[in-house]
Regions:
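Hinge/capping helix and adjacent helix->loop/strand transition within the periplasmic-binding protein
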Residues: 35, 60-64, 86-95, 108-194, ...
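N-terminal (or domain-start) structured segment
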Residues: 5, 20-119, 183-197, 201-209, ...
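An extracytoplasmic/periplasmic, membrane-proximal ligand-sensing/linker region
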Residues: 9-10, 245, 270-327
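Paired acidic/hydrophobic, glycine-rich loop segments that form the ligand-binding mouth/hinge
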Residues: 93-100, 160, 209-213, 228-231, ...
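Short helices/loops that flank or line small-molecule/ion binding pockets
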Residues: 81-93, 151-153, 176, 180, ...
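Beta->alpha turn/N-cap motifs
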Residues: 98-104, 195-196, 212-218, 232-235, ...
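C-terminal lobe and pocket-closing loops
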Residues: 217-284, 313-316
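Hydrophobic membrane-insertion alpha-helices, especially the h-region
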Residues: 8-21
Length: 327
């Protein structure tokens, strides 16, 4: 990860379905990377980072011939913890996986959720990406300095929206911005949304003064001129986008987000290894490499126990950072 401050050390896509149990009985012989009946859950609404990641991964895996007919579904609620609870309840289901990231880590803490990521089977961390600071195209703020100047005058009157619960990336990034600008984080009027899709409607509808979310979520809207990009939160500019890093603009912020995949608890070693092998083959495919480039994602691949250790460390960092910010 590229985070240089405690906040920056924290970086978060899954499908939603309400109805019958998620257990699937896909037919066919399972060979190689084929997992008949595989389902990807997205724990927030359509259009967010988890959703884009899951649907991109499913399409790329199918296009590469790694497996077929992956179902992607959304189960939003409580920052991803509703989906997490459902995943944990599917004990031993080797045909289910959930797209997730730092947002779920934070939501577990902010919602005091009974189920945590320690109750899942870690599969892989896939990507890392910068957050973007955006406003609607008709916003009065043309630069990051203009926005921060108005924000400092009265933080409570300038609501900032994010697609994650407190403790998630879209919450921590503006808190880091506030701290760097001399604004007390506790004075920030942060409005959480259940994913970038919901947040986008509020930015375009002027329900929030500005929004913070992953670059891949709003790339199309930025290029189409629907959103004005003021800055990016990571260590370098994003190729193809005309916006400074926060550090270039004079704010000591270096923050990146991440996303990965977890599975239910209770998988056999063979089931876990098969799902991991599928994701490894996906990661190595030209289809996935092209999708990472198109979405502005950086490779952050990590599997198995190493990913499990990373999740534990992220949880500790979320607790530490929220305490540091007085939140």
């Amino acid at each position: 990860m590229q985070l240089r401050t405690p906040l920056a050390l924290l970086g978060a896509a899954v499908l939603v379905l309400v109805g019958p149990p998620l257990l699937s009985t896909g037919g066919g012989t399972e060979t190689g990377t084929q997992i008949p009946g595989l389902r990807f859950m997205v724990p927030n609404t359509p259009g967010g980072g988890y959703d884009i990641t899951a649907r991109t991964a499913a399409k790329n895996a199918e296009d590469a011939g790694l497996t077929h007919n992956i179902e992607v579904f959304n189960l939003p609620g409580a920052g991803g913890t509703v989906g997490l609870s459902r995943l944990v309840s599917e004990h031993g289901n080797g045909r289910l996986a959930m797209s997730m990231g730092l947002g779920v880590v934070g939501a577990v803490r902010s919602n005091d959720a009974p189920k945590t990521l320690a109750d899942t089977t870690p599969i892989a961390r896939l990507t890392e990406e910068q957050d973007v600071v955006v406003v609607a195209k008709d916003s009065p703020y043309k630069t990051i300095d203009e926005l921060v100047g108005a924000w400092k005058e009265d933080p409570g009157k300038l609501p900032v929206g994010g697609g994650s619960a407190p403790g998630g990336p879209d919450h921590l990034a503006p808190m880091l911005m506030a701290q760097a600008a001399g604004i007390a984080p506790k004075d920030v009027n942060y409005i959480p949304f259940d994913g970038g899709g919901e947040l986008l409607a509020s930015i375009l509808g002027d329900k929030v003064a500005f929004g913070v979310s992953g670059v891949g979520e709003y790339l199309d809207q930025i290029k189409a001129g629907e959103l004005r990009l003021l800055a990016v939160t990571g260590p370098k500019r994003v190729a193809g986008l005309d916006a400074p890093t926060l550090q270039e603009a004079g704010y000591d912020v270096n923050f990146t987000n991440w996303r990965g995949i977890v599975a239910p608890p209770g998988l056999t070693e063979a089931e876990r290894d098969k799902l991991t092998r599928l994701i490894e083959e996906l990661h190595d495919s030209p289809e996935w490499r092209q999708s990472m480039k198109q979405n502005g994602w950086d490779d952050a691949f990590l599997t198995g126990d190493a990913f499990g250790d990373f999740l534990d460390a992220q949880d500790r960092r979320v607790v530490s950072v929220l305490k540091e910010l007085g939140l």
